[in-house]
């Protein structure tokens, strides 16, 4: 199969299906590709192709994920679907597949179930900004009042986790009927309506290059007669010669100025998101800056030591721990380019955490790290990854 050239004409948005097992996430994913293929000539994928998700490794964790693509009149969507609940948990926590918005699939026949709640909570914790609801299996419900009841329950659940439940678009349909080519209201038109809801309700994501400048520092050199150079890969934004910058994390925040940007030994007037660059700093001594700090636009990021996180603990099979850990556990937390020791505070009533579990915990680091909510990290013991996490809420 030849790969067509990736069309940049339409803006690119990342979405994914979430929801309880057997509520129809994969069937809906297949229906979305089919309906879009009929409208725009993109590729349709059937259920089995999507369900046979290949395993990927993200930060040393094995995750099964299916990636499909489809078009709307306005956009190009990249869509992730996971076969198992554990894959969702890992995917969302590691950020392996970042979502600009999620499609919550809930069976109209069953209403919200435990994983419906858990996926909404996870979406809140890992910073999925928007949720759109597809009430599936509407062909199995002939009672309009029951549909209304399920819709109300889903809205209440969204409100409970600080999503705007009352204003969330809810589309009622049957993914299976749409796949079968049904043109009644709950068939193909429902899928088209869902795509329109994605277009209308998920704002176009801000590109990394448009965000404020940030570069994790990987290395520091001193160049005689020119000053100190820090190197790293620009995470977001743009840095230009003459920009005032801050060095954040591990020690007191320091101010500096960029007097040069170089890439592959060539001087540039700027470095941007994705570039591996060296940034020459004026008035900063070699010993005043170290790996693990970040270089950033002043006032855009601050150092913190205490935060609430959502963590996935690797199973033994994934190369993680063989035994549980308890409160007071003190591993290394690896942020961007460096390890910092921290202590884990487990939630009330949780005595221990088993390999393969996911848990909400508070972490207290011994040194401050430049962070904002949504930052991913690894948990390590002696250089071996034993967990993955995301900063859900900064405490201090």
Curated annotation (Swiss-Prot):
It catalyses: GTP + H2O = GDP + phosphate + H(+). Mg(2+) binds at residue 26. Residues 81-84 are annotated as: G3. Its main location: cytoplasm. It is found in: Cytoplasm. Keywords: Cytoplasm, Elongation factor, GTP-binding, Hydrolase, Magnesium, Metal-binding, Nucleotide-binding, Protein biosynthesis. It is an enzyme of class 3 (hydrolase). HAMAP family: EF_Tu_B (MF_00118_B). This is Elongation factor Tu. It comes from Dichelobacter nodosus (strain VCS1703A). The lineage of its organism: Bacteria, Pseudomonadati, Pseudomonadota, Gammaproteobacteria, Cardiobacteriales.
């Amino acid at each position: 199969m030849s790969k067509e050239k990736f069309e940049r004409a339409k803006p690119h948005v990342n979405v994914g299906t979430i929801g309880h097992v057997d509520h129809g996430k994969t069937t809906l994913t297949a229906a979305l590709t089919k309906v879009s293929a009929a409208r725009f000539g993109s590729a349709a994928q059937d259920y089995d192709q999507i369900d046979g998700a290949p395993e990927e490794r993200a930060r040393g964790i094995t995750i099964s994920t299916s990636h499909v693509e489809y078009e709307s009149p306005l956009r190009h969507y990249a869509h992730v679907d996971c076969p198992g609940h554990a894959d969702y948990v890992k995917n969302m926590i590691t950020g392996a597949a970042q979502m600009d918005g999620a499609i919550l699939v809930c069976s109209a026949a069953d209403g919200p179930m435990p994983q419906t709640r858990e996926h909404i909570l996870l979406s809140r914790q890992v910073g999925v900004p928007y949720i759109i609801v597809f009430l599936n299996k509407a062909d199995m419900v002939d009672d309009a009042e029951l549909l209304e009841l399920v819709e109300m329950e889903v809205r209440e659940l969204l409100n409970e986790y600080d999503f705007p439940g009352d204003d969330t678009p809810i589309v009622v349909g049957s993914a299976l009927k749409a796949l079968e080519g049904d043109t009644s209201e709950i068939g193909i038109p429902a899928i088209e309506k869902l795509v329109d809801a994605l277009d209308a309700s998920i704002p176009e994501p801000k590109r990394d290059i448009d965000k404020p400048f940030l570069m994790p520092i990987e290395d520091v050199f001193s160049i005689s007669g020119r000053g100190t150079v820090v190197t790293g890969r620009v995470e977001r934004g743009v840095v230009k010669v003459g920009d005032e910058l801050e060095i954040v994390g591990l020690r007191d925040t320091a101010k500096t100025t960029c007097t040069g940007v170089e890439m592959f030994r060539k001087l540039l007037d700027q470095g941007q998101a994705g570039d591996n660059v060296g940034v020459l700093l004026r008035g900063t001594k070699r010993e005043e800056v170290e790996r693990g700090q970040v270089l950033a636009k002043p006032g855009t990021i601050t150092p913190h030591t205490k935060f609430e996180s959502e963590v996935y603990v690797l199973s033994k099979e994934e190369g993680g721990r063989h035994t549980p850990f308890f409160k007071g556990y003190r591993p290394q937390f690896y942020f961007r380019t460096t390890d910092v020791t921290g202590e884990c505070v487990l939630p009330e009533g949780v005595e221990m955490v088993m390999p393969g579990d996911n848990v909400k915990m508070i972490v207290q680091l011994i040194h401050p790290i430049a962070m904002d909510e949504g930052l991913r990290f690894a948990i390590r013991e002696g250089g071996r990854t034993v967990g993955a996490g995301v900063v859900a809420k900064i405490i201090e």
